[in-house]
Amino acid sequence: MPELPEVETVRRVLNEELSGLEIKDIDIRYPNIIEDDIDYFKNNVINKKIVGLDRLGKHLIFLFNDGAMLSHLRMEGKFFYVNPDFEINKHIHVIFHLSNGKLLCYQDVRKFGRFCYRENKELYTTPPLVNVGVDLTKNNNPNINELYKKITNKRIPIKTTLLDQSIIAGLGNIYVDEVLYESHINPNRASNLVSIGDVSNIVLNSEKIFNNAILNKGTTIRSYTSSLGVIGNYQNFLKVHTKTECPCCKSTLIRVKIGGRMTYFCEKCQR
């Protein structure tokens, strides 16, 4: 699943390519991928000029003058910016026809991704964005006390809590493993047992890892690969996720499922 750094990489490429172009038509081949009524969505997106792209957490925001189209890639979503002779395969579910003659194709093998339109006045006050937690790449001074209350209000493993997008936006399975390793926190620890100092470390390490991963254009492993000519390199800097040995103490890393998600950690370095 693309996490914040991968979505930011997509945003940067699409912002460069699409800004100033109009969406002239839309082919929707799998209607369930559109959260809105189809006619409402088309009426509010067709003939709109893309003035830029923004992002909040894992949500891409295609900005128009009077509103925005939101896209969430979920597990397998990918965009292809292509010429009109591009071969349309069965996994391409939405095709945007652009004013320069090119196509923006959305491919999603799992069909989990979603699109919707929101007016400017409701963009951040209605779902999905109203439910998104703090984005540490945009907020350099988050309220630690508020985050501490949200986290310690839960008794589930801290790994599972940090995957909740209403707390820290953009963290997914890969980066939660890395953040907890750098913070010396066992992913099985109950969330209500973390200290406010632990939360501060989680925030600091999330910021650091997000920024480094963005500089390296994200992590390219398993199903997340580039569809826009950009290959991520951060997989070369991962400390524990998919690894077998702790880089610090050289112990064999633990590989176990927590909340249904494969998790990697060092039981000696993480308490």
Give names to the regions the model predicted.
Residues P2, E6, N139, D198:
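Catalytic cores of large soluble enzymes that bind and process phosphate-bearing ligands
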Residues E22-F41, D54, H59, L70, ...:
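Basic, nucleic-acid-binding surfaces and adjacent catalytic neighborhoods in DNA/RNA-processing proteins
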Residues M1-Q107, F112-R114, E245-C248, R261-R271:
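A cross-family signal for N-terminal binding/gating loops and helix N-caps
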Residues N65, M69-G170, Y175-E182, A190:
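Phosphate/anion-contacting hairpin/loop surfaces
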